[in-house]
């Protein structure tokens, strides 16, 4: 009997049928560690899920991975749901993932830690960037739900502590998919106004899922970029969100946020009285100190007979004047002596001294003649003597040793 020969595509199709007909492989949870993770420009994620002995290539299409709250990475242990199929062009079997979650840690918790680490490295939590909360704001902007308990608590505290302070409420969702965007828009709107001195971003307590809007990166960056100081008052005292780390001041509750935003009127009055008392005591001490110094100086001899101070100074000036005269006289004497010596040396080197000893200087024009080659027959020359000048005309020149014939 002759064996049937199959094409590669036929074999691949048969394998695909076997896999798709297996109910276990069509609805499957796999646990393992991610390796070779790659987030493609198309938005699809490619990675391998492995354990100690085996591995399986996996893909998570963009439509599914957009729902992830965390970013998969190499070394992360995960639980993945999907089905096993075949990629026919290469004949590879692979795992098509439609749901992915960290093994052991919740996806939201992991996303929180990843974003916190990222923003901290960027410097969004740095203390030197945080703005000072004004002592007594004129108007407070509040981004929160207009119907929640948080806004009622805030308004109650404001009324009790300093009822003259104005509050502008910017309504916003505080949970759900659209909440983060509305919170950002509320912060940006308050920054566009000129009458807001401080912003409170707030909501009541809840689960991590309910508070998640305040862990979104867009909210964190809006708080960081706000030119107006921002106080976060999210959840209960034990709840922490990314917004708390970025805010200029973190309050454990909405009520506490309002208390931190404005001073109690009675406390402010006490503070002003305390400042006045400290200022009064400081000025009084300075006055007493200056009075004591003045009294002490009035007892000194120099102030009972102040003319003695001037007499001593006059004598000192006279003494300095005499010293200056002596110094100048000595310098002039030295200078005169140096001038006399130099004049003598200069005089001894003068050509006129040579003339006085019986010599003469012969010139052609203004140039001295020191060789017979400098003159021609018929030239008029001048001889300088000690008592005058002789004009001569050259009739003949003779070299050294030549006889007059």
Curated annotation (Swiss-Prot):
Keyword Metal-binding among UniProt keywords: no
EC number in record: 3.1.11.6
A biological process term (GO) from this entry: DNA catabolic process
Protein's cellular compartments: Cytoplasm
InterPro entries: Exonuc_VII_L (IPR003753), Exonuc_VII_lsu_C (IPR020579), OB-fold_nuc-bd_dom (IPR025824)
Key words of the record: Cytoplasm, Exonuclease, Hydrolase, Nuclease
GO cellular component: cytoplasm; exodeoxyribonuclease VII complex
GO molecular function, one term: nucleic acid binding
Catalysed conversion reaction: Exonucleolytic cleavage in either 5'- to 3'- or 3'- to 5'-direction to yield nucleoside 5'-phosphates
Record-stated family: Belongs to the XseA family.
Function (record text): Bidirectionally degrades single-stranded DNA into large acid-insoluble oligonucleotides, which are then degraded further into small acid-soluble oligonucleotides.
Subunit structure: Heterooligomer composed of large and small subunits.
Protein name per Swiss-Prot or TrEMBL: Exodeoxyribonuclease 7 large subunit
Provenance organism: Halothermothrix orenii (strain H 168 / OCM 544 / DSM 9562)
């Amino acid at each position: 009997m002759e064996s049937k020969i199959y094409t590669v595509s036929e074999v691949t199709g048969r394998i695909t049928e076997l896999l798709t007909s297996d109910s276990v492989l069509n609805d499957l949870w796999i646990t393992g560690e991610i390796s070779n993770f790659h987030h493609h420009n198309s938005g699809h994620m490619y990675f391998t899920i492995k354990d100690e002995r085996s591995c399986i290539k996996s893909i998570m299409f963009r439509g599914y991975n957009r729902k992830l709250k965390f970013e998969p990475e190499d070394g992360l242990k995960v639980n993945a749901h999907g089905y096993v199929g075949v990629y026919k062009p290469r004949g590879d079997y692979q795992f098509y993932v439609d749901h992915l979650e960290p093994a052991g840690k919740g996806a939201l918790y992991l996303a929180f830690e990843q974003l916190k680490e990222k923003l901290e490295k960027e410097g969004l939590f740095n203390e030197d960037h945080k703005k000072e909360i004004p002592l007594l704001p004129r108007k407070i902007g509040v981004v929160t739900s207009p119907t929640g308990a948080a806004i009622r608590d805030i308004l109650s505290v404001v009324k009790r502590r300093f009822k003259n302070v104005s509050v502008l409420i910017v309504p916003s969702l505080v949970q759900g998919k659209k909440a983060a965007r509305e919170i950002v828009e509320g912060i940006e709107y308050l920054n566009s106004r000129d009458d807001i001195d401080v912003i409170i971003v707030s909501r009541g307590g809840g689960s991590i899922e309910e508070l998640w809007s305040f862990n979104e990166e867009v909210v964190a960056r809006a708080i960081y970029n706000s030119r107006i100081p921002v106080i976060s008052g999210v959840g209960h005292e034990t709840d922490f969100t990314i917004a708390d780390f970025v805010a200029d001041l973190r309050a454990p509750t909405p009520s506490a946020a309002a208390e931190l935003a404005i001073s109690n009127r009675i406390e402010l009055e006490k503070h002003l009285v305390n400042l006045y008392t400290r200022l009064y005591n400081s000025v009084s001490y300075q006055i007493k100190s200056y009075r004591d110094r003045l009294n002490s100086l009035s007892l000194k001899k120099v102030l009972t007979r102040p003319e003695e101070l001037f007499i001593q100074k006059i004598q000192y000036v006279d003494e300095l004047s005499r010293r200056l005269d002596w110094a100048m006289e000595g310098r002039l004497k030295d200078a005169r002596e140096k001038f006399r010596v130099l004049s003598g040396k200069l005089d001894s080197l003068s050509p006129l001294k040579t003339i006085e000893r019986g010599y003469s200087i012969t010139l052609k024009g203004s140039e001295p003649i020191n060789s017979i080659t400098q003159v021609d027959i018929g030239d008029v020359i001048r001889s300088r003597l000690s008592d005058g000048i002789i004009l001569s005309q050259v009739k003949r020149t003779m070299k050294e040793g030549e006889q007059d014939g």
